[in-house]
C-alpha cells in the first residue's frame, strides 16, 4: 500500500510540474535554478533530446514507451538490491508520467 502511495505521488508530481511549466513559463523560455540546472518550457515530439521528432508517429512512441516500461518493471521485479530497486521504481514513475503526457498532448 505504501509503494502505491509513493508511486501515485511521484507520477502526479511529475505531471503537475509539467502542468505548471506549461501554464506559467512561455514556450522556449527558461528559468535558471542553479548554475547547472534550468527549467525550460519545450515540447518534445520525439525521443530523448528530441531525436526523431516528427518522424515517428506518437502512437508508436507510446507503444515503445510501454514496452520499455515493461522491461524496466521486469528488472525491478528481479532485482534484489534495494538501491537499484528504488532507482528503477523512479524510472518507472517518470516513464508512466511521460506516457500519460504523450497520450494526452502528443508530446512530452
For the regions a protein language model found, what residue spans apply to each?
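Alpha-helical transmembrane bundles and membrane-interface segments of multipass inner-membrane proteins
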Residues: 1-108
Amino acid at each position: 500500500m505504501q509503494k502505491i502511495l509513493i508511486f501515485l505521488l511521484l507520477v502526479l508530481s511529475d505531471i503537475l510540474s509539467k502542468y505548471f511549466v506549461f501554464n506559467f513559463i512561455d514556450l522556449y523560455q527558461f528559468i535558471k535554478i542553479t548554475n547547472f540546472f534550468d527549467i525550460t518550457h519545450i515540447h518534445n515530439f520525439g525521443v530523448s533530446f528530441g531525436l526523431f521528432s516528427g518522424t515517428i508517429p506518437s502512437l508508436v512512441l507510446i507503444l515503445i514507451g510501454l514496452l520499455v516500461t515493461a522491461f524496466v518493471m521486469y528488472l525491478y521485479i528481479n532485482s534484489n538490491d534495494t538501491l537499484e530497486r528504488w532507482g528503477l521504481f523512479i524510472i518507472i514513475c517518470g516513464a508512466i508520467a511521460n506516457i500519460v503526457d504523450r497520450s494526452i498532448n502528443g508530446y512530452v
